Regions:
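Short, surface-exposed loop or secondary-structure junction motifs
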Residues: 52-312
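Short active-site loop at a secondary-structure junction
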Residues: 2-61, 149-162, 239-242
Length: 313
């Protein structure tokens, strides 16, 4: 069918600035943490790991040393359900699905029965897709896995894991699930009525645009109303790196709020000082800002912004 202006889309990594960063800015505004604070002060699972001294600023600038990606979902897969390698650099008789450049996955595999169920229950509340529910313990195990991943050097390295940790910090400080915190502080009062994590709890499936035709981790199902990015999916759909669904109109409200120094429709949500800091601070080793990407004024080809974008963006 023809798309409608109120259709919801999976925002993917735009979740980072449309959701997680808003929550981080709000808590910073309230004096709940400092940028040079160590993230382990707010996430006990990181104490005693090589992440213990990583600061919140380093997470926001993507200079934490944490790898760009980690396949958390592999812990849920039954290794006895397939033969040979799960991944291949080239397609063969049992590896037809391409998921990246020179990377193909096994065609048939099963999940560990103790971690994945077909129906919802108190023990299996984390819905990944239709008829796919993860054990409640898996969300916490992801934080443990992040703690065990070896740190790399502290150069600029864009990482979804940085924002997964920031989401965990938001929840530990606010004592609320981040989706509910955002609803309370921003989305509901700003009348962003077409913005939500876990959109199928509020909207009909027909109101949500399908993301992919067949997802290999969801057993070839059409993905509609469930977050596509696997790390967010295996967090139960609410994550710091992905998971938010919205419309262009609602997304515009967030960035109008930021452009206007924390005010939207006559109401103040963030101080101008906090907005100025997060919008203008720039890394000393990359073009990145505090959570935001910024223009590369020295190389317009590599810049993520249009050439017409002003340098002060």
């Amino acid at each position: 069918r023809k798309g409608e202006k109120d259709d919801l889309y999976d925002l993917a990594s735009l979740t980072k600035t449309t959701a997680t960063l808003l929550a981080v800015m709000k808590l910073y505004d309230e004096g709940k943490f400092g940028l040079t604070d160590r993230i382990s002060q707010y996430i006990p699972a990181l104490k005693g790991t090589d992440k213990e001294r990583v600061t919140i600023e380093e997470l926001l600038l993507h200079q934490s040393g944490i790898p760009a990606f980690w396949p958390f979902y592999k812990e849920t897969i039954d290794k006895d359900s397939y033969k040979g390698s799960f991944y291949r650099a080239r397609p063969d008789a049992s590896h037809h699905t391409q998921i990246d450049t020179r990377l193909y996955v096994i065609d048939k595999f099963d999940y560990r029965k103790e971690l994945m169920a077909k129906t919802f229950s108190a023990d299996y509340p984390l819905q990944v897709a239709d008829s796919m529910f993860l054990h409640r313990s898996f969300r916490d195990s992801i934080m443990v896995q992040i703690g065990r991943i070896p740190l790399k050097d502290r150069r600029y390295r864009y990482s979804c894991l940085n924002f997964m940790l920031l989401k965990e910090m938001v929840e530990n400080i606010s004592k609320m699930p981040m989706n509910l915190f955002l609803d309370k502080e921003f989305y509901k009062p700003m009348e962003m009525n077409r913005t939500a994590y876990l959109p199928l709890r509020q909207f009909k499936k027909e109101e949500i645009v399908p993301t992919v035709k067949a997802d290999y981790l969801r057993k070839g199902k059409v993905l509609q109303g469930y977050v596509h990015y696997e790390s967010a999916a295996f967090m139960g759909g609410v994550s710091g790196n992905a998971g938010l669904f919205s419309t262009a109109r609602d997304v515009a409200k967030v960035y109008q709020l930021l452009i206007d120094g924390g005010v939207y429709n006559g109401k103040r949500y963030l101080s101008r000082e906090t907005c100025d800091l997060f919008l203008t601070h720039t890394s000393k080793i990359s073009r990145r800002g505090l959570g935001f990407d910024k223009p590369d004024v020295n190389n317009s080809v590599k810049s993520p912004c249009a050439e017409e974008a002003p340098e002060e963006v």
